[in-house]
Amino acid sequence: MLFRSTELSPENRGVGLVFQNYALYPHMTVKQNIMFPLENLKGVDKLTKDEMLERSYRVAKLVQIDELMDRKPHELSGGQQQRVAIARALVKMPRVLLLDEPLSNLDARLRLQTREEIKRIQRETNITTVFVTHDQEEAMSISDQIVVMKLGVVQQIGAPQEVYDNPLNLFVAKFLGTPPINVFEGEIKDEDLYIGNEKVLAAKGISDQPVYVGIRPEGFIYNPEGTLHLELSSTEVMGRDVSIVSRHPAAISPIVRSIIDADTVVSPTAENKVAFSLKPHKVFIFNKETEERLYPEVK
């Protein structure tokens, strides 16, 4: 592995690692686990016992476990064990911190709490941090820059909101978003976008072809005069919003989910259909073979 064009052995790379399995030494206390990397420092980096203790307590206080230093791993909760692992990675003052799915062993409440802690720690230490996760919500909430990968190949890099708003391909569009994007089979005819037999949007500049159409749940506007008709299955009240669950024969997934304002009164037709208009900036068109994004001309 090369760092700054210099071949370095693992202990000299300046990388702190935290994995899904925290790999704490069960026979050691929290203090001993955190101090362990410092005991292997050599040469000019070697520390005295007092220096190791001072740095270990400083890092423990940063991750808020300084009152747990005499406990052993089996006496800690999952969230506390995770903080010990982060402290052990930070104690060598790395140039880069790699977190490889560090939250996957925690329950939902602890995941949310620890996610905020990791953001705080990164801000306070200002260490470049690479956070690896399969959870798109974690990726969106914790990162300044997001890298979406598929089978080891980078699909898109950008700020989380930018990637969400402007996916380069269908994989990226489907990966980001809760609820997930709705995907339909569609067709471009005479520079118009059709879903089924309904013309839903203009698609100026795109040649006639079959396409995939991605519509974000918030991209629907309930409109009795709208051009896209869905078969209503149910509605779910979520406080300020209402989630409308419906179906469409051209939809790839079994259900179509749209999010609208809770004040909107939805009145299905006698055939149990609801009609929608679409927000153009929440609709994405993809080549059906390559699944790459197609861009209509903007007037």
Q: Residue spans of the language-model regions?
A:
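Short, small-residue-biased leader/transition segments that mark boundaries at the very start
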Residues: 1-2
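Short clusters of hydrophobic/aromatic residues that line enzyme substrate/ligand-binding pockets
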Residues: 5, 52, 294
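Residues that scaffold the ATP/ADP-binding catalytic core of kinase and kinase-like folds
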Residues: 8, 113, 166, 174-175, ...
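ABC ATPase nucleotide-binding domains
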Residues: 10-16, 20, 24-171
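C-terminal boundary and immediately downstream tail of ABC-type ATPase nucleotide-binding domains
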Residues: 165-188, 214
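Non-catalytic connector elements of ABC transporters
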Residues: 192-299
